[in-house]
Amino acid sequence: MKIAQIAPLAESVPPKLYGGTERIVSFLTEELVGMNHDVTLFASADSRTNARLVPVCEVALRLSSRPVVDSVAHYVRLLELVFKQAHEFDILH
């Protein structure tokens, strides 16, 4: 199956600091890749994965050297990237 994994942008996948959701996204993504699914991860560029990575922002928002006052623009970009490629996937998760 072609699966899109859509991660929060606050932490990298897997997280360098606290990030329960991002850790679960990482576990699930790596297991799906191990089961020979074609997995694409939409996440921050500092994420590490065996899946295809579509970087949404340069670094996880919480780790950015420039304070992120409003994360809405980053999430709009995430949704834009997913929407443009949605037809390529069997599952969006």
Predicted regions and their residues:
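Soluble or luminal CAZymes and related metallo-dependent hydrolases
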Residues: 24, 70-84
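Nucleotide-activated donor-dependent transferases that construct or modify glycoconjugates
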Residues: 1-18
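Short N-terminal targeting/anchoring amphipathic segment
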Residues: 82-93
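Short, flexible loop segments at the rims of nucleotide/cofactor-binding pockets, characterized by
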Residues: 18, 67-74, 91
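Short amphipathic alpha-helix
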Residues: 19-32
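N-terminal strand-loop element at the rim of the active site
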Residues: 9-12, 29-72
